[in-house]
Structures are given as structure tokens and as C-alpha cells.
Amino acid sequence: MPKPIALSRNPSTPLFQWRAYYEMTKPKVVALMLLTVLVGMCLAVPGVVPIVPLIAGMAGIGMMAGSAAAFNHLIDRRIDGLMARTYNRPLPKGRVSIAKALTFSCSLGILGFVVLYVLVNPLTAWLTFASLIGYAVVYTAYLKRATPQNIVVGGLAGAMPPLLGWTAVTGEFHGNALLLVIIIFAWTPPHFWALAIHRRVEYAKVDIPMLPVTHGVEFTKTCIFLYTILLAIACLLPVLVGMCGPVYLVSSTLLSVTFIYKAWQLKFHEEPGMAMKLFKFSIYHLMLLFIALLVDHYLWL
């Protein structure tokens, strides 16, 4: 009986190399980010999004986001190798060399910038470049190691995608787009602090001053709870300015109440693994919130 053919796991094979580069772009994170870009595009126009800024904008922003993620892998390669969550990443494991990782990161970023500049508009290209620098350099290379408020200050770069989507279609700033930025900005600290509680021993081992390491777990739980309340208020802003209708209002209220309740449980009635459960819920919260924005927008056209 013939033996089944097994896929090669030789690091030198093209398939294995491709998977390593793909992993460096943090595809799941970029996918969630692109959802917020798409919502920003759709809310910027009353009807259908023009095809060129839609495709070129999503592609260019996606490439530059992947480039920022790859730079994050490159800069954090030493501490990644010491943490259980990240030790198996391509650079710590030697699946990609430093030189190749740098070449890949730069090439992907440059290609994304050119696509945005030529096919979309210069404003979106430069704003996306600023976001890349904010995440890869300001946050990863400096803030992450400098202050327990790293997530709060550095979160602005990660909150930009809806604005990028908006400018890709309109070519200009708009206050409504900034409201979407505020939502993600308020969402970021409780999202990452929940993970930091779960991984606080590892962060302490590599001298990363995450809030649970520097100020303790109980203080961090309090901050998470307060930020979920702040997030709930931020989520109401699109309704208050007339951007959204009842579908979004009901959806965001249910999501906010659930997030606050789970943060309350973490603070006052913690069970084993509660921080990680909150972290995972926060991902669904953001995803469902922006889907609700999209549904509400087109439902009332």
C-alpha cells in the first residue's frame, strides 16, 4: 500500500518560508483592522464605495499594516524568544533571518505606500505611513519598554484604520471618522491589559513594564473596569451625532453592557482564566460593533 505523501517541514522549502513570512504579518490582527478600514470607507459615502479606492485602499493599507507587524516581530525578536506566547515565532526559531525579515518588512511597506499614493491619494498614504511609524517605532521600539502607559499612548496608531478608510474614499478628514478612532482608542487598553494580566509573569521576566507588572493586578483590573465604562460612552458618540440608527444603538448597548459585566466579574468575582476570557471577548466586541455599524448604515439607505 503506498505511503501517504507528507508535506515537508524543511525550513528551506518555499512553502515553509512563505508560511513564516505570512505569520510575520499577523494576519488575524490585520484582518480585524481591515474590517474597521472597510467600515470607515462605507460610512464615508451614502451609497456604494467606488471600486478603485476600495480595492487599492484595502490592499495598500493591508500591506502597510503587515509591514508594521513584521517590524514588530523584528524589533521584539529577543523578548519573543523568552515568552511562552511568542517563542515559536519565525525569528526566534530561526525560520527567517534578520536580513530577510528587514528586507521583507521594508519591501511590503514601500509597496503598500506606493499603491496608496498612486491609486488612492497622498493623504491616506502619509497617514498610513504615520501609523506604521507609530506602531513599529514609537510603540514597539520605545513606549513598550519605557512606560506602563505604553498601550494607552501607543494605542492611537492602532486606532487609526477607520480614519484611513474614510480618507481613502473622500481624500479629507471628517469628524465622524475621528469618532470611530476614539472607539478603538478606548477599546485598546482593556483589551491588552486583560492579556497582560494573564501573561504578567512573562512580561516581568523580559522587563516589559506592563501595567499589571508595575502597578499590580488589582489596580489593572480597576483600570479595565473603568475603561469599559469609558468605551461604552465612546460607543454612543456615533448615535449622538446622527451617524447611526437603532440597529447600532441596540447592538452597541448590548455589547457594552456585556463588556462591563465581564470586567466587573474580573474585578470582583474572578474565576480561573477570566482575564483571558475577557481578552477573547474584547476581540468579538470590536468585530461585532463594527459589523453593526455597517449593517445599520446600509439598512437605512
Swiss-Prot record:
Spell out where the chain crosses the membrane: 29-49, 51-71, 96-118, 123-143, 151-171, 177-197, 223-243, 244-264, 281-301
GO annotation, cellular component aspect: plasma membrane
Q: What is its main location?
A: membrane
Q: Which GO terms describe its biological process?
A: heme O biosynthetic process
What superkingdom does the record give?
A: Bacteria
Pathway(s) it belongs to: Porphyrin-containing compound metabolism; heme O biosynthesis; heme O from protoheme: step 1/1
Keyword Phosphoprotein attributed: no
Membrane topology term: Multi-pass membrane protein
Annotated coiled-coil positions are none
| EC number per UniProt | 2.5.1.141
Catalytic reactions on record:
heme b + (2E,6E)-farnesyl diphosphate + H2O = Fe(II)-heme o + diphosphate
Picking any one GO molecular function of the record gives: protoheme IX farnesyltransferase activity
- Matching InterPro entries, A to Z? Protohaem_IX_farnesylTrfase (IPR006369), UbiA_prenyltransferase (IPR000537), UbiA_prenylTrfase_CS (IPR030470), UbiA_sf (IPR044878)
Arranged from A to Z, the UniProt key words for this protein are: Cell inner membrane, Cell membrane, Heme biosynthesis, Membrane, Transferase, Transmembrane, Transmembrane helix
Localization of this protein? Cell inner membrane
- Give the UniProt family note: Belongs to the UbiA prenyltransferase family. Protoheme IX farnesyltransferase subfamily.
Q: What else is known?
A: Carbon 2 of the heme B porphyrin ring is defined according to the Fischer nomenclature.
Reported function: Converts heme B (protoheme IX) to heme O by substitution of the vinyl group on carbon 2 of heme B porphyrin ring with a hydroxyethyl farnesyl side group.
**Name this polypeptide is given:** Protoheme IX farnesyltransferase
Its source organism is Shewanella halifaxensis (strain HAW-EB4)
Q: Which gene encodes it?
A: cyoE
